[in-house]
Amino acid sequence: MTTHTTFPKALIVEAVPDILSRITSILRGYPDIELAFLFGSFAGGTVTAESDVDIAILCRQTPSFDRREEIRAALCAGMKREVDLVDLNGASPILRMQVLKKGIIVIDNASVYEDFFVRTTGEYDDLKRVRKGIEESILRGGIGGAHA
C-alpha cells in the first residue's frame, strides 16, 4: 500500500528557489539547451513523497536518445530524485502549451522563447479548431456513427 503525503504548500514555496537553482546549475553544463522549464507537481505545488521532477527542455536540434539520457541522469543525480525529462522539440502542442501555461522558466533565451511561444500557440490553436470540428461531427453522428 502506497501512501501519498502532500507537503504543506509553504514548504514547497520555500524549496522551489533551491530546486530551480540546482536545475539551472546542472543544465548550464549543456550549452545546446536553449530553454528549460520546471513543470508538473513541483511547479504546481502538489508535490508528494513519490513525485518525480518534471523538466522540459528545448535544444537547438532534437537531442539523441543517448544525449537525453545523459541529461536526465545528471538531473537525477543532482536532484536526488527521479526526473521525467521532456524534449520539447518532439512534444505535442498540447504538452508544450501546458508547459508554457504552468511551467517555470529555468533556462531562458528571449528570442528562442518568443519563437517557441508563437509556434506553440499557433499549433495549439490549429489543433483546437480541428478538434472542435471533429467533436461537432461526432455529436452529429458523422464519423462512424449513424446519420440522423
Residue ranges and their predicted role:
Residues 39-51:
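Short edge beta-strands and adjacent turn/loop segments
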